[in-house]
Amino acid sequence: MATTTPSRSTRSSMQSPARGTSTPLSPTRISRLQEKEELRHLNDRLAVYIDRVRALELENDRLMVKISEKEEVTTREVSGIKNLYESELADARKVLDETARERARLQIELGKFRSDLDELNKNYKKKDADLSTAQGRIKDLEALFHRSEAELGTALGEKRSLEAEVADLRAQLSKTEDAHRVAKKQLEKETLMRVDFENRMQSLQEEMDFRKNIYEEESRETRKRHERRIVEVDRGHHYDYESKLAQALDELRKQHDEQVKMYKEELEQTYQAKLDNIKRSSDHNDKAANTALEELTERRMRIETLGYQLSGLQKQANAAEERIRELEELLSSDRDKYRKLLDSKEREMAEMRDQMQQQLNEYQELLDVKLALDLEINAYRKLLEGEEERLKLSPSPESRVTVSRATSSSSSATRTSRSKRRRVEEEYEEGGASTGFGAGHSLGSSRITASEGSSRTITSGQSSTTRFHLSQQASATGSISIEEIDLEGKYVHLKNNSDKDQSLGNWRLKRKIGEEEEIVYKFTPKYVLKAGQSVKIYSADAGVAHSPPSILVWKNQSSWGTGSNIRTYLVNTEEEEVAVRTVTKSVLRNVEEEEDEDADFGEEDLFHQQGDPRTTSRGCSVM
């Protein structure tokens, strides 16, 4: 560490090399030149650090904008896909319930057809036995016909007894058929109710499992957007298969109903004709025998026809069952395919998470570097303050001049160095940008005061040092706050601090600078500031591209303006001020100094030999 203290000296001892080029450099001059080079080197390092921090902050803003845009896109896509998936799943569940109900009904009808077939077989066997018995009796009657007329009376009596038995049997058969029909209907109703309750229970269970899986696996919902296309394609095939199957089953059902009805009518007619023939056979034995033989032949042919038809119906029923099994296998294969697609989408989501984590790690490393730079700059400033304290010197604007590179060849360079120092202090003490001025937000009001600065003007006879003070005051009555304003008039930064979107349609952002005319920026009618997001409104000369909703450009205004008293406020559609930020620049003092003291700030830039007894109150320390 080197300590230098400027002092007042005579003109003969402070002459520049240009006045005495033949005089060799003294050790004091060499030491001062070395200290000057060392300070320039340190100033270069500080400038590099500041540029690096600004670049990191710009990169940080860019990354935050990218992350917010990605989060908005992801949220929008996930919500849309979730709604589509829920609707598609509800439709699929409804179709499955209808299919299960239709299958149960078809199974009931198939069981009914099988029971009708068994009943027809039993009736056929019974009628065949009755036919054999009738043939035996016909032979007996033919034998008895030749015996005597007395036996004819006996036969007539037997005939009457048989007719009574047939009537009793018919009545019993009718009652039994009615009871059987009622029982079958009740069984069908109970079966349908049981199947319906089972389907409803299964649907509720599936819905409960689905809601549980939805909340546990929200990350998988993004894969549904690929599934939507597949479902739309397969849905058409599925609907075609269902419509064709339903049409075929309806046709089979109608054919079965018509055939069964026809069979019943024909059997009843045949049975009635047989009874009539038996009655007439007692009166006309010869005619009855021939009629019985013809009826037997017709019945045999009819039974064979019915057998063929029943076998055809059984084949159709088997084909329908085979088709149902094929459709179930197709549905199972589709489910397996969709499951594989879901697994692949899960892997893609895992890769995306890894990439996001890697980006976050890189971002954290950048933040660590920025923090290290901030600490180094703060240490630099504390060393300067400690050296001033050690030498019992009050902090003066001249002590800050050494932070930035400057020469005494012109007064403009000195003013530039002090201006740079002021901006550095505003950036690292206030947390704002290099040219911006702002701080945190609150619903009340907050006051933030920047570091003092100074400017120096050198004339032929004297110099003046002007110190100024920057302060700002911000307040907000709602969720929108004015987060930052640029002192050079390039932009104004607004932020939505709530968790809800805020419509800024037709709101106006106004700026008043001293006594100048007020300028007004009006938002578009449909502009909305998202929750937690921010927007910067740049002037036309800022050189920034228009990129809504985070970056807006005021094309009709070249600059927001600069001045010593800047008031920026946001007004809603009801002319109420919802956010205000005021920046004030005030002059603290103006000190006049003599010409010979200005000479000390000449070519050697406040450097002198250490330990000079002519040390004044000015001094600085350099790391």
From Swiss-Prot:
Residue ranges annotated for the LTD domain, each copy included: 468-585
Positions where lipid (S-farnesyl cysteine) attaches: C620
Listed GO MF terms: structural constituent of cytoskeleton
Cross-referenced Gene3D superfamilies: 1.20.5.170, Lamin Tail domain, Vasodilator-stimulated phosphoprotein
Region of interest called Tail, as start-end residue ranges on this chain: 380-592
SUPFAM superfamilies: Intermediate filament protein, coiled coil region, Lamin A/C globular tail domain
Bias (Polar residues): 19-30, 443-473, 612-623
Motif residue range(s): Nuclear localization signal: 420-425
Gene Ontology biological process terms from the UniProt entry: heterochromatin formation; nuclear envelope organization; nuclear migration; nuclear pore localization; protein localization to nuclear envelope
Propeptide, residue positions: 621-623
Subcellular location: Nucleus lamina; Nucleus envelope; Nucleus, Nucleoplasm; Nucleus matrix
UniProt region (Linker 1), positions on chain: 64-74
Region (Head): 2-27
Record's compositionally biased regions (Low complexity): 1-18, 398-416
Main location: nucleus
Coil 2 as annotated region, ranges: 236-378
Compositionally biased region (Acidic residues): 592-604
Occurrences of domain IF rod (ranges): 35-391
Entry-annotated residues carrying Phosphoserine: S26, S396
Segments for region (Coil 1A): 28-64
Family of this protein: Belongs to the intermediate filament family.
Protein name in UniProt: Lamin-B2.L
Organism: Xenopus laevis
Gene: lmnb2.L
